[in-house]
Amino acid sequence: MKKRKKDSDLKENVVFNIQSIIMSVLMAITLVTIVTMGFLLYQRFKLAIDKMAVSNTEATVESTVDRVNSDLLDIRQIFDAANYNIVQEFDISSEKFAEQFSLLYEVNSDKIESLALYGNEGRLIASEPVAVEKENIDVKGQDWYKNAESAIENVHFSIPHIQNLYEDGLYRYHWVVSLSRYVDINDGEIPGSGVLLVDMKYSVIEDVLKQINDSSEGIYYYMISRDGQMIYHPRKTEMARGLFEENSLKASGYEEGTYEITTDGHKESVVVGNIAYTGWKLIGVVPESVQTARINNFRYYIFTTIMVLMMMLLEGNRLISRKISKPIRKLDESVKTYEAGGKTDIYLSLIHISEPTRLRRI
């Protein structure tokens, strides 16, 4: 009797062990498959995020360069109109000169802060809007004036600065970008020369760059001159306080294209675009932290998906292991019934065989 009970317990353990082994194998295969697929999916998504961020930045830089070029072309056309259609065309003492000079300003006052014509000694000849020049102002010492005298064939673009030439009763400060050029002047019978000055409103550039930075989600864009001087930066306030640094001098040496650089131990992608005629550069920066944040968000999604999938497969594997081990359990029950003196037949259901086989004990 004890021997029969011992044999019964042994068979029960065998059945249990077989089901456990089947379930363990299925779980191991499932776990390895899910982890491998999750890792591959994560790596693929990480590469896709990196490429997408850089690709989007390249597209933004390209479209912004086109827009800035278009705006600056408009300003240059205003400058050329002032030079060739007014200064070169009319005597500076004529009413027609004053009329056309004023009209040109009025038509383009949304883009330019002022128009001015100076003689070769720095004397103010004409200005729009009409303004009183500040006392003791050294016009010839201004960068825009010196640049115009040093290279007389070119239109020179200054970096943004506060206009400081004229009195303003309201004490307003106007940020401008000065365009200047050495020009010939008609002054009666006496030919002369001087410097034509067009002060473009800084907002023409600032508004464009502010717009793309406001919607960039961590990626930022700034503009520098050919020698690395800052024209626009979204974090200029922090830079003025010493809370943020930008290596604009190094960036000024980059040619147009995309670069992978390391700054303070952090990797970042830099996209460089050239602004026509001025020598300025528009630079888009994709910090590593931006890509890391996006990847971390996806990492949580992957982890949650894997956990849900594992719970579903765990239940599925349990059902499959029960199904596979069912013939063995049925055989065990048949043997137990036979040993207990019940049925004289042992029922055996073979896997993959639809018709059961009965083994009769002789």
Kindly give the residue locations of the regions a language model identified.
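Short, hydrophobic beta-strand elements of compact beta-sandwich sensory domains
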Residues: 178-181, 187, 192-202, 261-302, ...
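Single conserved hydrophobic/aromatic residue that forms the stacking wall/gate
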Residues: 351-362
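Alpha-helical transmembrane segments of integral membrane proteins
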Residues: 26-38, 302-313, 317
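Extracytoplasmic/periplasmic ligand-binding sensor regions of membrane-associated signaling proteins
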Residues: 111, 126-199
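Extreme N-terminal signal-anchor transmembrane helix of membrane signaling/transducer proteins, especially
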Residues: 1-47, 51
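Solvent-exposed, extracytoplasmic
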Residues: 98-108, 195-238
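Membrane-proximal alpha-helical signal-transduction linkers
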Residues: 323-346
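Extracytoplasmic/periplasmic sensory segments of membrane signal-transduction proteins
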Residues: 3-4, 22, 39, 43, ...
